């Protein structure tokens, strides 16, 4: 008996427990209603849809007639009979979805008590069911503020630069030639502003080339520009100026003066006409004696060059005339037109024909 008294509870305790179970059953009937309630764990997410949990009653259809849809529990009475630890900052209203019954507002389950861990009525019968919507809302981390670039000063606003051209290659305010990254310079930038940027490619050494080729020191026209100014101009402009200075220095002219043009044909000294025709009324002179002999044949009528073709008695004073005549018999035409298939036996005939193609 002593062991039974220590194990079994008293009759008064069992009586109180029976009333407690009846109250739990009534609470479950009220809680599991056919209405759709918004039991979201926290404030609605602006980027996503609101969470709605539809709880359907598991009571048999016979008990629906006994329930009064107009009755509702008094929240003050419920909080008085079943106190619980209320977490601060969770006072929110839970509105029933529109249905056939009247619309009423109740306190959310978070304001009725901490059902998951605090002492309350719902801990026992509802503790076995895992409802994520009854848990306390977890604090949401603050959203990162959008990045706002600092306002630029009025003088530092970037300006659109024109595309690269040969005429502006390496000039101040333009772009470096043959470069993937454009480094524009301000129009009023002082000398040496771009000296920190390395050369994108080695500049052609025109000055050294002229020194090695001619064996002379390249003279400088005027004063020497400072290195910072050369870096600001860019490699293309520096190389061009050095090359122009070297060429002008070798010619003894200023950089702006073009060197005089030289003819490719060298004029040979003119031969003196030492051979003069002695026929009366003819004073022609020739540099060669053979030319004078051919000319005298026109006065004397001598024709030493006769045609050897059978049946041809033509005779000529010059050998080249006999050669052209002989081509008439053979049909040889060495002078061909490059624009058409025609050919000629004489060069002067080909020259006249080429004028027709012009």
From Swiss-Prot:
Note down the stretches annotated as region Disordered: 35-69
- Zinc finger spans (C2H2-type)? 275-299, 305-329, 335-357
Q: Quote the SMART domains the UniProt record gives.
A: ZnF_C2H2
The reported effect of residue 295 to N is: Loss of DNA binding and transactivation activity. No change in interaction with SIN3A nor with HDAC1. No effect on repressive activity
Q: Which Pfam families would you find in this protein's record?
A: EKLF_TAD1 (PF16832), EKLF_TAD2 (PF16833), zf-C2H2 (PF00096)
Check the record and name the InterPro entries matching this protein.
EKLF_TAD1, EKLF_TAD2, Znf_C2H2_sf, Znf_C2H2_type
* GO CC, any one term: nucleus
User: What is the recorded post-translational modification?
Assistant: Acetylated; can be acetylated on both Lys-270 and Lys-288. Acetylation on Lys-270 (by CBP) appears to be the major site affecting EKLF transactivation activity. Sumoylated; sumoylation, promoted by PIAS1, leads to repression of megakaryocyte differentiation. Also promotes the interaction with the CDH4 subunit of the NuRD repression complex.
Which SUPFAM superfamilies has this protein been placed in? beta-beta-alpha zinc fingers
Give the tissue specificity: Erythroid-specific. Only expressed in bone marrow and spleen.
In this UniProt entry, the residues modified to N6-acetyllysine are 270, 284
Q: Name one GO biological process term.
A: positive regulation of DNA-templated transcription
Q: Carries keyword Thylakoid?
A: no
The record's function comment reads: Transcription regulator of erythrocyte development. Binds to the CACCC box in the beta-globin gene promoter and activates transcription. Probably serves as a general switch factor for erythroid development. When sumoylated, acts as a transcriptional repressor by promoting interaction with CDH2/MI2beta and also represses megakaryocytic differentiation.
Similarity comment text for this entry = Belongs to the krueppel C2H2-type zinc-finger protein family.
Subunit structure of this entry?
Interacts with CBP and EP300; the interactions enhance the transactivation activity. Interacts with PCAF; the interaction does not acetylate EKLF and inhibits its transactivation activity. Interacts with CDH4; the interaction is SUMO-dependent and leads to transcriptional repression.
Q: Please identify the protein, giving its name as recorded.
A: Krueppel-like factor 1
Task: Tell me the organism's taxonomic lineage.
Answer: Eukaryota, Metazoa, Chordata, Craniata, Vertebrata
By which gene is this protein encoded? Klf1
């Amino acid at each position: 008996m002593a062991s039974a008294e220590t194990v079994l509870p008293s009759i008064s305790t069992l009586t109180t427990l029976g009333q407690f179970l009846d109250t739990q059953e009534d609470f479950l009937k009220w809680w599991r209603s056919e209405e759709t309630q918004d039991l979201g764990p926290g404030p609605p997410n602006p980027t996503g849809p609101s969470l709605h949990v539809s709880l359907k009653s598991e009571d048999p259809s016979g008990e629906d007639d006994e329930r009064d849809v107009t009755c509702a529990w008094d929240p003050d009475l419920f909080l008085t009979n079943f106190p619980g630890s209320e977490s601060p900052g969770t006072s929110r209203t839970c509105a029933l979805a529109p249905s056939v019954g009247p619309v009423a507002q109740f306190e959310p389950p978070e304001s009725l008590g901490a059902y998951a861990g605090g002492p309350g009525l719902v801990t026992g019968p509802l503790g076995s069911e895992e409802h994520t919507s009854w848990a306390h809302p977890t604090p949401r981390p603050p959203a990162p503020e959008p990045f706002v670039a600092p306002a630029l000063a009025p003088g530092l606003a970037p300006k659109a630069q024109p595309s690269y051209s040969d005429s502006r290659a390496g000039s101040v305010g333009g772009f470096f030639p043959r470069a993937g990254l454009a480094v524009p310079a301000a129009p009023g930038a002082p000398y040496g502003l771009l000296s920190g940027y390395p050369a994108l490619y080695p500049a052609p050494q025109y000055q050294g080339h002229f020194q090695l080729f001619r064996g002379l020191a390249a003279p400088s026209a005027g004063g020497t520009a400072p290195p910072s100014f050369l870096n600001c101009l860019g490699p293309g402009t520096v190389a061009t100026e050095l090359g122009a200075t070297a060429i002008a220095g070798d010619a003894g002219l200023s950089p702006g003066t073009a060197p005089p043009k030289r003819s490719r044909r060298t004029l040979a000294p003119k031969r003196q006409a030492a051979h003069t025709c002695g026929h009366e009324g003819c004073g022609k002179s020739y540099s060669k004696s053979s030319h004078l002999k051919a000319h005298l044949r026109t006065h004397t009528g001598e024709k030493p060059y006769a045609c050897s073709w059978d049946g041809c008695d033509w005779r000529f004073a010059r050998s080249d005339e006999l050669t052209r005549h002989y081509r008439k018999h053979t049909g040889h035409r060495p002078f061909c037109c490059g624009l058409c298939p025609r050919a000629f036996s004489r060069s002067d005939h080909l020259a006249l024909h080429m004028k027709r193609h012009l």
